Design a protein with these regions (language model features):
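Nudix hydrolase/Nudix homology domain
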Residues: 2-22, 52, 89, 126, ...
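Conserved Nudix-box catalytic region and its N-terminal flanking loop in Nudix hydrolases
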Residues: 3-9, 24, 66-111, 153, ...
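Acidic, metal-coordinating catalytic segment for phosphate/diphosphate chemistry
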Residues: 25, 29-68, 72-73
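A short coil-to-beta-strand element that immediately follows conserved catalytic motifs
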Residues: 26, 120-127
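Short, solvent-exposed loop/turn elements at beta->coil junctions and helix N-caps
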Residues: 29-32, 128-133
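Short beta-strand micro-motifs in enzyme catalytic cores
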Residues: 40-44, 89, 140-142, 168
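Active-site-adjacent beta-strand/loop module that shapes the phosphate/pyrophosphate-binding cleft
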Residues: 45-50, 133-154
């Protein structure tokens, strides 16, 4: 079934969301329940279309970027690092949060590629935009396709600390990486989405990719 055109939904300055069907969702009260180093938790009271008010807890996240770095041999660059919430290392894309004020997402992606994989890229395209888990968080991430890769000289490479100190870097054939997704060996959400998007885009020669500065309406704008 073909996807329909997006509905003509609006959000006014008072925080009232109105859908084209006439349903309204109004935030009547809001407070910050928790502030952490990266995330915060906002507690909203939302008036529903039936007039009732329900509480919604929202994990507020600054947003993130990831990179599918594809070399001339059709291999993707993967990093293997420890993730404490799941208490194990995962195979992932080079990625990071949008934590530098005013930094364009593609520049953040280039920075992460340099810091985590010791690489630069001569060509960048926008691969896919994702809402991580919209039932509980505003976290959104943008995944770029990077090509024409070059290695950063050893003297200029980033010194990694914390979870990144023992990070492993590997290049994996894109088709093999897709197989590892289906086998359950790659489970990181951004990696799954990015790799499958890259494999799909490759089918038509990467001709349908958007420019790196394409509009990103779902990008988080604040931490509270």
């Amino acid at each position: 079934m073909a996807a329909s055109e997006p509905a003509a939904n609006t959000v006014d300055h008072a925080g009232v969301f109105s859908s084209e069907t006439g349903h309204r969702y109004e935030v009547v009260d809001s407070d910050i329940a928790f502030i952490g180093r990266i995330i915060s938790v906002r507690r909203d009271a939302v008036r529903m279309p039936d007039g009732g008010v329900s509480q919604r807890d929202v994990i507020v996240h600054p947003g993130a970027v990831g990179v599918v770095a594809l070399d001339e041999a059709d291999r993707v660059v993967m990093v293997y690092q420890y993730r404490h919430p799941v208490r194990r290392p995962l195979w992932e894309l080079p990625a990071g949060i949008l934590d530098v004020p005013g930094e364009p997402p593609v520049e953040a992606a280039a920075r992460e590629l340099a810091e985590e994989a010791n690489l630069t890229a001569g060509r960048w395209d926008l691969l896919v935009d994702v809402l991580a888990s919209p039932g509980m968080t505003n976290e959104a991430y943008r995944v770029f396709l990077a090509r024409d890769l070059a290695t950063i000289p050893l003297s200029d490479q980033h010194v990694r600390v914390h979870e990144e100190a023992d990070m492993q870097i590997a290049r994996v054939d894109l088709d093999k990486a897709v197989g590892q997704i289906l086998d359950g060996a790659i489970t990181n959400a951004m990696a799954v989405v990015g790799l499958l998007a890259a494999a799909t885009a490759r089918l038509n020669g990467f001709t349908r990719l958007r420019p790196v500065d394409a509009p990103w309406p779902d990008r988080p704008r604040s931490v509270g």
